[in-house]
Curated annotation (Swiss-Prot):
GO molecular function terms listed in the Swiss-Prot or TrEMBL record: ribosomal small subunit binding
Subcellular location: Cytoplasm
Family: Belongs to the RbfA family.
A GO CC term attached to the entry: cytosol
Name listed for the protein in its UniProt record: Ribosome-binding factor A
Xref: NCBIfam families: rbfA
Superkingdom, natural source: Bacteria
Alphabetical UniProt keywords: Cytoplasm, Ribosome biogenesis
Claim: Cytoplasm is one of the keywords in the record: yes
Taxonomic source organism: Syntrophomonas wolfei subsp. wolfei (strain DSM 2245B / Goettingen)
UniProt cross-references to PANTHER family, sorted A to Z: RIBOSOME-BINDING FACTOR A, CHLOROPLASTIC-RELATED
Gene Ontology terms: biological process: maturation of SSU-rRNA
Amino acid sequence: MSKRRQERMSVEIMRVLSQIIQEEIKDPRIEFKNLSITRIDLSNDYSHARVNISILGDEIQREEAMKALQKAKGYIRSALAQQLKVRHAPELEFRLDRSIEHGIRISSLLEEIKEEAKGSNE
């Protein structure tokens, strides 16, 4: 499979998954405004897709949202196959992506250092 085709398929899977989660999943533990699909890693044969998800909120909210996604995984996969018009949708593996959380933490630490440096110069 060409890398270009694989990338296009990953982008399309991300778009469709976002739509399914936002519009079709009715589990109250999943709030789409707090959930973002950050990346899709698709296997060369399209049989597996690692779905990296960022969830804003505390640890309990993240765990509950991940449990809800795991529970709905079968439905999400069949809806994905229907919308992509493929016979076999990839097996989905949801993973929590903490990169946004780490970025926010780093930004706040840099801001603290900047404020301390400003205070010591005065």
